[in-house]
C-alpha cells in the first residue's frame, strides 16, 4: 500500500528510484559512454549505437570463491534466483538447509511400514536406522512413498541369506536383473562397505541392502544414519516414476545421486547448520581441493547432449562426481525453490515430461539459461 501511494503522488520519485534497483537490459538507454553497472551476475558497459547510448550485452563477473568460514548463517533479504546466484552464493548452503528443516518440522512421517532384517552373523553398525528414515519421510511428507521399506543388513557370511530376501521382496520386479546385486555390494570379507536401493514395481515395496566390514565401524557414514537416509531418498525418488516413465527418459544421474546426497545431509543434520556444513565439506572436499572444474567442464558434465535420456552419459567420469557435483547443484536448486523442487522433477518425468520441460515447470526458467548461471557460479568456486 505504501509503495502504491508513492507512485500515485509523484512519478518523479519513481523515475529517480529505478536506476538503483531495476535490472539492466541490453539495448536499453544509458547515461554516458563508458559508464559501467553491475546487474545480476553481469557487468554492463554504456556504448554508442548509432545516435543512441545503450547498454551492451554485458559480461559475466567472476565471483570470488566462498570459503568454508564465509558461508552466511542467515536468510537472504531478497529472493534467490538464477540471475543473482553469483553475488549471493554465500547464502546457498544455509537457505537450502533451512528450507529443508522447515519441511521436516512441518510434516509428520508418512504411514510407513519399516522392516529391519539383520543377518544371523551380522552386527549392524547403526542400531537405530528408523530415526534417519523418518526424517527423510517427513521432509517429503507431501509425496507418495513406499508402502513398506525393508532394510537388510548383512555381511560376507550372510550373502546367501540376503539373496533369498532380495528374491522374496523384489524378485523380477526391480526394473533390471538384480540377482547379482547382493554379491556386488560385498565381494569379499574386507570389501563389504556399501549399500543399494531397490524397488518392487508391482508391490511398491522399497528395499535397501546395507553392508559394512568391521573396519568401517568408526565411519560416520555407517553409524550416523546418513547412509539409510540416502537410500530411502532413492526409494522416494523411484516411487515418483517407477513403472510409469516412458522408455527413453531417465532423470540425470547427478540429480539422482546428488539429490539423495543432499537430502541425507540436510535431514540428518536439520537441527545443526554447523554439522550440515561439516558433512557438506566432506562430500565436496575433492572438488575444492583440485580446483580443476572449469565452466566448460562443468557444462559438459551437467548438460551433455541427450540429457535426461540415460545414465551412460556419465560412464566416462569418476563415479563420485555424480555425488559431489550433483550435491552442489541440488543444494542450489533447493536454496532457490525448496526441497520439493528436486523431487518434483522425478514426478513430472514419470508423467512423460522431458527433464528440460520438467525443470521449466518447476522453476519457471529455461534449463539452458539456468545451467549457464549454475556452471559459472560453480566454476568460480571450483576452478
Sequence positions of predicted segments:
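Short, basic/low-complexity N-terminal boundary segments at the transition from targeting/disordered tails
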Residues: 18-29, 84-90
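Non-catalytic architectural context of zinc metalloproteases
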Residues: 62-217, 221-226, 366-371
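Acidic/His/Gly-enriched intrinsically disordered linker/tail segments
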Residues: 245-324, 336, 346-383
Amino acid at each position: 500500500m505504501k509503495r502504491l501511494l508513492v507512485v500515485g503522488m509523484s512519478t518523479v520519485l519513481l523515475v529517480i528510484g529505478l536506476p538503483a534497483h531495476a535490472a539492466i537490459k541490453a539495448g536499453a538507454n544509458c547515461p554516458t559512454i563508458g559508464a559501467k553497472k553491475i546487474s545480476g551476475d553481469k557487468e554492463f558497459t554504456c556504448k554508442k549505437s548509432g545516435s543512441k547510448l545503450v547498454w551492451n550485452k554485458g559480461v559475466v563477473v567472476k565471483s570470488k570463491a566462498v570459503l568454508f568460514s564465509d558461508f552466511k548463517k542467515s536468510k537472504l533479504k531478497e529472493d534467490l534466483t538464477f540471475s543473482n546466484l553469483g553475488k549471493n552464493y554465500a547464502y546457498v548452503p544455509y537457505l537450502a538447509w533451512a528450507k529443508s528443516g522447515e519441511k521436516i518440522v512441518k510434516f509428520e512421517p508418512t504411514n510407513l511400514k519399516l522392516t529391519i532384517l539383520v543377518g544371523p552373523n551380522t552386527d549392524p553398525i547403526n542400531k537405530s536406522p528408523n530415526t534417519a528414515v523418518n526424517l527423510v519421510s517427513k521432509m517429503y511428507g507431501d509425496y507418495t512413498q513406499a508402502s513398506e521399506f525393508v532394510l537388510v543388513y548383512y555381511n560376507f557370511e550372510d550373502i546367501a541369506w540376503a539373496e533369498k530376501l532380495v528374491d522374496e521382496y523384489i524378485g523380477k520386479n526391480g526394473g533390471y536383473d538384480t540377482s547379482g546385486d547382493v554379491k556386488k555390494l560385498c565381494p569379499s570379507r574386507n570389501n563389504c562397505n556399501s549399500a543399494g536401493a531397490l524397488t518392487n514395481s508391482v508391490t511398491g515395496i522399497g528395499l535397501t541392502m546395507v553392508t559394512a566390514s568391521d573396519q568401517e565401524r568408526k565411519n560416520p557414514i555407517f553409524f550416523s544414519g546418513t547412509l539409510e537416509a540416502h537410500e530411502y531418498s532413492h526409494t522416494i525418488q523411484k516411487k515418483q516414476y517407477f513403472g510409469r516413465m516412458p522408455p527413453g527418459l531417465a532423470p540425470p544421474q547427478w540429480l539422482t545421486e546428488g539429490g539423495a546426497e543432499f537430502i541425507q545431509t540436510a535431514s540428518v543434520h536439520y537441527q545443526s547448520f554447523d554439522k550440515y556444513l561439516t558433512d557438506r565439506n566432506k562430500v565436496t572436499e575433492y572438488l575444492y581441493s583440485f580446483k580443476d572444474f572449469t565452466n566448460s567442464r562443468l557444462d559438459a558434465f551437467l548438460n551433455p547432449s541427450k540429457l535426461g535420456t540415460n545414465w551412460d552419459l556419465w560412464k566416462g567420469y569418476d563415479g563420485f562426481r555424480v555425488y559431489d557435483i550433483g550435491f552442489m547443484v541440488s543444494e542450489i536448486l533447493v536454496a532457490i525453490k525448496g526441497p520439493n523442487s528436486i523431487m518434483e522433477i522425478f514426478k513430472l518425468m514419470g508423467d512423460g515430461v522431458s527433464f528440460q520441460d520438467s525443470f521449466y515447470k518447476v522453476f519457471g526458467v529455461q534449463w539452458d539459461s539456468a545451467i549457464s548461471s549454475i556452471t559459472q557460479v560453480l566454476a568460480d568456486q571450483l576452478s
